[in-house]
A protein has these predicted regions:
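Active-site nucleophile-His-acid catalytic modules used for acyl/amide transfer and hydrolysis
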Residues: 175-238
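Glycine-rich catalytic cores of cysteine/serine-nucleophile enzymes that process amide/ester linkages
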Residues: 84, 89, 95-192
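Alpha-helical transmembrane signal-anchor/signal-peptide segments
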Residues: 61-80
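Transmembrane alpha-helices and immediately adjacent membrane-cytoplasm interface residues
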Residues: 28-63
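Hydrophobic/aromatic-rich, well-ordered segments within soluble, folded domains that form packed cores
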Residues: 79, 83-91, 228-239
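Membrane-embedded alpha-helical segments of integral membrane proteins
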Residues: 1-33
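A short, structured loop/turn motif at beta-sheet edges
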Residues: 79-83, 137-141, 199-204
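Extended acidic/polar, glycine-enriched regions
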Residues: 49, 58, 77-80, 84
Length: 239
């Protein structure tokens, strides 16, 4: 299944379907060979599978693609004492998903002023699937919100299945809360729910610094998004 899926989502046009079917037939022939004692069939499939693994390993994530505007820039965070400087912070004004004003900003936040952290769950496919955002609150400024996104290229559609097969890079978005929550509640008409965490200010600061470290790591070295293992929930859990 993995090999057929990889071929289907990584090859263009009708070639993708034909290659996936061909791989499935080869796998079936290999199983028949194991059952019948015909060694050439499973050996042939093993060679095919190893070749496919070699092709898989040749795919590398990149920051250098023609990204959609809202994911065109990755944030970076510099720390000097208790002050965090967040560059490439998104503060768009959304009227619809296609009609918006672009604003990228640099903002500074005082770690000593962190008061807590909130979670937003934005449900976009009934109750089954939600996108997670983490928002940090401060006593002297507006919240700072982070989201982990599929970094799509212009003209590229999102597919949960394609996300298993090195089809998308991962992106962090650092944003004004009105931008990133408003995009989902107003422009996309999603059902967003706010959960206030019981974390202490110190715990919230520690989580914020963990975000800062991983954001800078991603800016230095791109990663693949994976629907199961590297998504908006699992990455936050590992932080």
């Amino acid at each position: 299944l993995w090999g057929a899926g990889f071929l289907y989502f990584r090859l263009p046009g009708t070639m993708a379907g034909l290659a996936a079917i061909g791989f499935g037939v080869a796998a079936l022939a290999g199983l028949v060979g194991v059952w019948s004692g015909e060694a050439r069939l499973p050996l042939g499939f093993a060679v095919l599978f190893v070749s496919l693994l070699g092709w898989w390993s040749s795919f590398h994530p990149s920051h250098d693609r023609d990204w959609i505007p809202e994911l065109a820039r990755l944030p970076a965070i510099a720390q000097e004492g208790d002050v965090l400087t967040v560059s490439n912070l998104r503060n768009f004004r959304w009227r619809t998903e296609e009609d918006y004003d672009q604003h990228w900003e640099t903002r500074r936040y005082d770690l000593a002023k962190v008061t807590g952290a909130d979670i937003f769950l934005s449900y976009w496919s009934g109750e089954a699937i939600a996108h997670l955002l983490v928002s940090f609150t401060f006593s002297d400024s507006v919240p700072l919100t982070f989201s982990i996104e599929v970094r799509r290229e212009k003209g590229e559609d999102w597919s949960a299945l394609a996300g298993f097969f090195r089809s998308y890079e991962m992106a962090y978005v650092a944003a004004d809360e009105r931008d990133i929550v408003g995009l989902r509640t107003h422009a996309r008409k999603e059902d967003a729910r706010l959960f206030r965490l019981s974390a202490s200010p110190r715990q919230a600061r520690d989580l914020l610094l963990a975000y800062a470290g991983d954001i800078n790591d991603l800016a230095a070295k791109p990663r693949w998004y994976n629907t199961l293992t590297t998504n908006c929930t699992t990455v936050v859990y590992h932080l």
